[in-house]
């Protein structure tokens, strides 16, 4: 029973988000870690992400039945009733938001709310099924965790938070399009209007290349803005160039699925590397950003 309730929260997604939360939190902490705040932020974000994933599983039951990758999910197989899953998701969300509000700060909580609403209310309920731009909208919610981690420490949305939002949003696009390419038939069978299905794989490759270039620029801004050091800069440049090279090789490959899977795997390596480096190679900016909102 416990295993089923764990599976429906998509623990892999939770773990991936925790890595980015830690990156944002430690970047902002700059070596001075409040461990109570750290724990509250990690657990709070985990609960909110878990809640969003359970709601997503509920909303996507009809789609999941049509896809090879998702046809054995807990709700599709009836291992947990839909009603129970809604109660479970609601309780997880309430607990997560309360922990962020009282354990971190209201700004961190509101960022969590915004990410949650975009993911569940905008992306899952509508955009995923009706628009080729669903991935773009969903990328904003996927970028929320590191920003929450950062703002849990700073209690302000400054240029550092904005750069993190840009980095992780831009990363989501080639990452997601790569999945859509090597899972092309699944998305086609479920009639999900992702870019590779609607516009074709060639167009998707162009978008992947452009987004990786934009991602590379955004990653450098963290050092140029005085938030991360030269070691981070070297790693960011290296992974960006390598990832871009992989994308460009996609124009000459014979098997798009194999190429897309490799691109997807490296995307995880890339974002994990950046999260680790921003955690350990931080700097104190010389001045505050012009874009600052203080609670």
Swiss-Prot record:
PROSITE patterns: UBIA
Alphabetically ordered keywords of this record: Cell inner membrane, Cell membrane, Heme biosynthesis, Membrane, Transferase, Transmembrane, Transmembrane helix
Main localization category: membrane
Enzyme Commission number(s) from the entry: 2.5.1.141
Enzymatic class: transferase
Job description of the protein: Converts heme B (protoheme IX) to heme O by substitution of the vinyl group on carbon 2 of heme B porphyrin ring with a hydroxyethyl farnesyl side group.
Miscellaneous note of the record: Carbon 2 of the heme B porphyrin ring is defined according to the Fischer nomenclature.
Protein name: Protoheme IX farnesyltransferase
Gene name for this UniProt entry: cyoE
């Amino acid at each position: 029973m416990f295993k089923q309730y764990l599976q429906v929260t998509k623990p892999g997604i939770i773990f991936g988000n925790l890595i980015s939360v830690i990156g944002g939190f430690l970047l902002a902490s700059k070596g001075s870690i409040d461990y109570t705040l750290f724990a509250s932020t990690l657990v709070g974000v985990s609960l909110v992400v878990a809640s969003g994933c359970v709601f997503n599983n509920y909303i996507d039951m009809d789609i999941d039945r049509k896809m090879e990758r998702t046809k054995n999910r807990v709700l599709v197989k009836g291992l947990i009733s839909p009603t129970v899953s809604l109660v479970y998701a609601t309780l997880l969300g309430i607990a997560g938001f309360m922990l962020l509000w009282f354990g971190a700060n209201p700004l961190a909580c509101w960022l969590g709310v915004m990410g949650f609403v975009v993911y569940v209310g905008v992306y899952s309920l509508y955009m995923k099924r009706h628009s080729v731009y669903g991935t773009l909208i969903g990328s904003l919610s996927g970028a929320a965790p590191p920003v929450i981690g950062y703002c849990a420490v700073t209690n302000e949305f400054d240029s550092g938070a904005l750069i993190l939002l840009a980095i992780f949003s831009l990363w989501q696009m080639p990452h997601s399009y790569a999945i859509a390419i090597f899972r092309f038939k699944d998305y086609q069978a479920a009639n999900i209007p992702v870019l590779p299905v609607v516009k074709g794989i060639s167009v998707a490759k162009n978008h992947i290349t452009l987004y990786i270039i934009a991602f590379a620029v955004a990653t450098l801004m963290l050092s140029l803005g005085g938030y991360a050091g030269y070691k981070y800069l070297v790693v960011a440049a290296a992974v960006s160039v390598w990832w871009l090279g992989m994308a460009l090789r996609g124009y000459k490959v014979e098997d798009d699925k194999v190429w897309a899977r490799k691109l997807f795997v490296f995307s995880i390596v890339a974002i994990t590397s950046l999260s680790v480096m921003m955690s350990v190679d931080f700097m104190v900016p010389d001045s505050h950003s012009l874009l600052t909102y203080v609670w």
